Regions:
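Bacterial N-terminal signal peptides that target proteins for export
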Residues: 1-10
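Bacterial N-terminal signal peptides
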Residues: 11-20
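Boundary at the C-terminal end of the N-terminal hydrophobic targeting segment
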Residues: 23-26
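Active-site-adjacent "subsite" loops/lids of carbohydrate-active enzymes
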Residues: 28-53, 83-137, 143, 147-151, ...
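Hydrophobic targeting/anchoring helices
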Residues: 38, 65, 70, 110-113, ...
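Short, acidic/polar
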Residues: 43-61, 119-132, 202-213, 268-279
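A short, well-structured beta->alpha microelement
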Residues: 47-58, 375-396, 403-406
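A conserved amphipathic helix/loop scaffold
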Residues: 377, 386, 402-633
């Protein structure tokens, strides 16, 4: 090779390295942080004073890499002159620029969407897509690319189909014909991204088509807001992580990031920070802080300081967040929630780069399936790490099936094959009830309409409250109870399975009893939860022991994050299923030595699920309220 050619190759290599470095270089090491401006607020930015003042407030408190400018919402389109002016302003601040569309006609009217059976409204949607593609090389459809109307035109177009069938076909076609196709004719380079909201288990009823849309859209985005679990949607904290993983598995490589708004911040700063943190634990490449005006307007309030902050040692530290700090040579006094986001994401960034790829207990949810809605998020909150897939996941030692799996007409055969390979299948009582006849060829178990009120788990402890469970019936000596409950069970007259096991071929089938109110899973006593966690830890290689509302996030490089969602500190045990010398805090370097415990080796039958397996290693840790720890072994 000549010196000249060598120099050329070296120059090209250096250029590529520089381009790669520039592409990932930003305010954060492991992800991008972005925000989004609604169309009406973009229009207000025609006023330069407003534009400059809001930017000063937001940018002084949170580091941003990108901003999305919305062109349409509620039948309003931002004028071209204003859009170009605002775009130029943010480009001058060093931000990447993307676009956005919200296909609503009136949010105040129960999020009224466009009527896709009406030709004139279809033309409006097409025009908005074309208009947006003129200005941006990527744009996001915010949340509302579904249909919630049952007007006379939609009723006539539906015909004899169910609403779900009609809407799934209607919106899959509308995405191709009215959004992606027209946009790419205007701008062949444009990437059109569909952002899905957080209510994934109900998507199909409104026309969100997770089977087809992620194929032809250039990317997707994930709503990770869980807000206040007591509000209308009743979503559990864990969903902020779980939904990212589910969408990653639907369209590997196409999930652009998460999306969190200010919802839940009235509960405490911690509730907002947790949503951001959990989103990033799923190793997503970007997060959108929705929206820009919330970052400007939602003021810091002393009521956002939770009582548990007094104990100290928390991962999210209110007093530090609201203290004055230095930025670009100036002293900044925090005034809005933007500061909460900045501190949380910079702290999380320190941890994310040390983690591998997320892993968990594979749970099969077929496309457009219903039943035991959002249950996996409750299971995540009792320490079972979830990893949801739209297809059956081969090569797993264990598979979790909820009632949703009944939608697959081949589900019984898939269960048989998993068991014949020596794997485990864990089914819920919801699936058992839905599949009584087909499952009879595998196990003769029955779950009907009979209920029981329980609060006593025998030697595994008692619940602080009574709750209702479905009764599972089985043949003695054909299936075996691993965890039982009654009222009372100790010295009582009856008991019912909470975790039941049966064998088939080389494998084992478990039935996990789900209470009528999923929230009562949090009332299972810690020793009972420990048995359940251990029985379902084969693919993860580790589990936790302790109360509910503590989640485990494992990764494929022998790291994990343990997070406490309780309002009080908790004492926990981290159990690694193999022998290891120590457990280390990934951020501080502190090491934990194995606990000195009598190793109870698993015995025969039911006893194999209690104590610790031969070779397992146990570590004791304490986690403050609403805090997390990154660990490696």
């Amino acid at each position: 090779m000549s010196k000249m050619n060598f120099k050329r190759i070296l120059l090209v290599t250096m250029t590529l390295l520089t381009m790669t470095s520039t592409a990932v270089a930003g305010k954060y090491k492991n992800f991008k942080v972005s925000t989004y401006i609604r169309a009406q607020d973009v229009a207000r930015m025609e006023d330069e004073k407003f534009l400059n003042q809001t930017w000063e407030t937001v940018s002084s408190q949170v580091d941003l890499d990108k901003i999305y400018l919305e062109t349409h919402r509620d039948a309003f389109i931002v004028p071209e002159k204003t859009l170009l002016k605002v775009k130029k302003f943010f480009q001058s601040k060093g931000l990447e620029i993307g676009g956005g569309i919200t296909f609503t006609r009136s949010e105040p009217s129960d999020f009224e969407t466009y009527s896709y059976a009406r030709p004139e409204e279809r033309e409006q949607v097409k025009h908005i897509s074309e208009y947006t593609a003129k200005f941006f090389d990527d744009f996001i459809l915010d949340d509302f690319f579904f249909i919630d109307l049952k007007n006379d035109d939609e009723i006539a177009a539906k015909g004899n189909k169910s609403w779900t069938e009609y809407r799934l076909r209607l919106m899959a076609d509308a995405g191709r014909e009215l959004v992606v196709g027209p946009a790419k004719k205007v701008n062949p380079k444009v990437k059109v991204i569909i952002k899905y909201p957080n209510w994934y288990d109900h998507f199909h009823g409104l026309g969100f088509n997770l089977e087809e849309e992620p194929v032809y859209f250039d990317g997707l985005w994930t709503g990770t807001e869980t807000r206040d679990p007591g509000s209308a949607q009743h979503l559990q904290n864990y969903l902020s992580y779980n939904i990212i993983r589910y969408f990653d598995n639907i369209a590997p490589g196409k999930n652009g990031g998460g999306w969190v708004d200010a919802g839940g911040i009235h509960m405490s700063m911690d509730r907002y920070a947790e949503q951001l943190h959990l989103t990033m634990l799923a190793r997503t490449p970007e997060i959108i802080l929705w929206n820009y005006m919330q970052l400007n307007d939602v003021k810091i309030d002393a009521r956002m300081r939770a009582p548990w902050q007094d104990a100290g040692g928390n991962s999210f530290r209110y007093d530090e967040m609201v203290a004055p700090f230095q930025k670009n040579g100036k002293t900044v006094t925090p005034t809005t929630m933007a500061r909460f986001a900045d501190v949380t994401l910079h702290e999380t960034d320190k941890l994310i780069g040390l983690l591998g790829n997320p892993i968990g207990l594979a749970s099969y949810k077929p496309y457009h399936s219903s039943g035991e809605d959002f249950l996996q998020n409750y299971l995540g909150m009792i320490g079972l790490p979830m990893d949801m897939y739209p297809q059956w996941k081969e090569g797993q030692q264990q598979i979790l099936l909820t009632q949703q799996a009944a939608k697959d007409p081949q589900i019984v055969e898939k269960i048989k094959q998993q068991l014949k390979k020596g794997g485990d299948v864990i089914i819920t009582t919801g699936l058992l009830k839905a599949m009584k006849e087909p499952l009879g060829d595998v196990v003769e178990l029955y779950c009907g309409d009979l209920k029981a009120i329980v609060n006593d788990f025998g030697f595994l402890g008692k619940s602080d409250r009574e709750f209702i469970i479905p009764q599972v019936k089985y043949f003695t000596n054909d299936a075996w109870e691993v965890v039982s409950a009654g009222r009372p069970l100790t010295g009582g007259v009856s008991g019912y399975p909470i975790l039941l096991r049966d064998t088939y071929s080389k494998g084992m089938l478990f039935v996990l009893t789900i209470p009528d109110d999923f929230g009562n899973l949090y009332d299972y006593p810690a020793p009972a939860l420990n048995v359940i966690r251990r029985a379902m830890s084969k693919d993860v290689g580790a589990y936790i022991e302790g109360p509910s509302k503590v989640a485990l996030f494992p990764y494929d490089n022998k790291t994990m994050v343990v997070e406490n969602f309780n309002d009080t500190s908790v004492n926990l045990r981290v159990v690694v299923n193999t022998k290891v010398n120590s457990l280390r805090n990934l951020l501080t370097g502190e090491t934990y030595k194995p606990a000195t415990l009598p190793q109870v080796v698993s015995g025969w039958g039911r006893n194999r699920f209690f104590g610790y397996a031969d070779g397992a290693t146990v570590f004791d840790i304490t986690l403050p309220a609403h805090s997390y720890i990154g660990l490696g072994y």
